[in-house]
Amino acid sequence: KDSRVRLFENKTNQGYIRNFMSGIVRCDSPYIMLCDQDDIWNWDKVELTLEKMKLMERENPEKPVLVFTDAMNFDSSTGKKLGRFHEMSHLNVKKVDTAHLFMENKCIGCTIMMNRAILPYLRELPEEIRVHDWWLALICSHFGAIGYLPEATLMYRQHEGNQIGGTSYSGYLRKRISKMKEQRQVLFDTYRQGKAFLRVFDSQMTKEQRKTATKFATMADASFFGRRYLALRYGFLKSGLIRNAGLFFLL
């Protein structure tokens, strides 16, 4: 046995979100990285991510900092490289401000590194959290900083259960369009996550942050034209023209 490895077994199935979160809050190291059991890390993944983290910590001392990177998709059955995740998914990783992150997650969880300064913000974990890495990114965008490393630091195993990556972007869009009812529910769940974030962190937000969060949390209650106005006025948008066209159709 390796003394550096500790195994915690949940008494019940908590689901992947709470499974990740319960692991994070148990960490006692200065930095925390997440991984999926079937991904392959590059030999310099930790070194490159830590270098970026140190740079950002100097600019944001004693604040929660999150660094995420790109990943190389590969087919689990053939081993063939399929292309970089963010290029294939057409996600704009430059837009990690709070407004854009309320509407769209940019991070790949298995590429993330965080510092310990994020732990005090994880004392309350509401049921409305959609994805653990999304929640972590929202925290750091509000109270610290987010950095992106364009290098593909791992091989991201593509399998049938993944939403984007191995399939073409056009195939991904066709799938989304064919399930409009489900997409409206996803949008509603995104509003619910924003409302939960406001509820949990209201007292820690600046006046401007609170205003933006409130506008997002109450978008569902606005009129047909009001929802579209709020999206444009406050920047509650997604990546690219096609995604935003779909968003405005659903709003």
Place the predicted regions along the sequence by residue:
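Nucleotide-sugar donor-binding/catalytic module of glycosyltransferases
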Residues: K1-Y169
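C-terminal subregions of glycosyltransferases and related glycan-biosynthesis enzymes
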Residues: F102, R157-L251
